[in-house]
Amino acid sequence: IVVHRSAGRYICGEVTAQVNALMGRRPNPRQPPPYLTQEGLWARPTALNNVETFANVPGIILEGAAPYAALGTEKNSGTKGFCISGHVNRPGVYELPFGVTLRTLIDEHAGGILDGRAFKAVFPGGASSSCLTAEHLDLPLDFHHVAQAGSMLGSAAFMVIAEGVCMVEVALRLARFFRHESCGKCIPCRDGTYQIVRL
């Protein structure tokens, strides 16, 4: 196993950008085809998975797929690494079965909202997902239910916002983040994020 430190940019999480970085190139994504399974690292077929996928493999091999598949929901079996940050007492990564509720994730695992404040919103799939509000606190967390609620689970990088925080300021900070992190390749992202910040 080789651990390769990325350049740290947001775009570096995209799989073709990761392959470019491993080859010493600028970590910009490319449009397939060819797909990585056909032509990836050093023009060879490449299987690229995240650490969460690899972490699940030993248990499945040792115990079989049935115990893992018995966890979770009907639509999404198994577990997920829920990464929670923002206005919580115990930010961190919690491996839990799909279907755990947002309320349970925040209150029982992340220790509740900082300073006893009320929950206002959460971005369940990181900065690029739509936020969920207090009406979603009992939502089962899996790809299906979060999509039905109008957002996306994605990498399950939960950004929790407490009551008293201005959501316009949050939107401006996210716009600045995306302006800074744009690879500059396409016009909507390169120029659009600049224009959004100017507004």
Each language-model region and where it sits:
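Terminal amphipathic helices with adjacent charged low-complexity linkers/tails
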Residues: 1, 114-148
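Flexible, glycine/charged-enriched surface loops at secondary-structure junctions
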Residues: 67-75, 79, 114-124, 185-187
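Ferredoxin-type iron-sulfur electron-transfer modules in oxidoreductases and energy-metabolism complexes
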Residues: 138-199
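Active-site loop ensemble at the mouth of alpha/beta enzyme cores that anchors a bound cofactor
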Residues: 21-33, 135-152
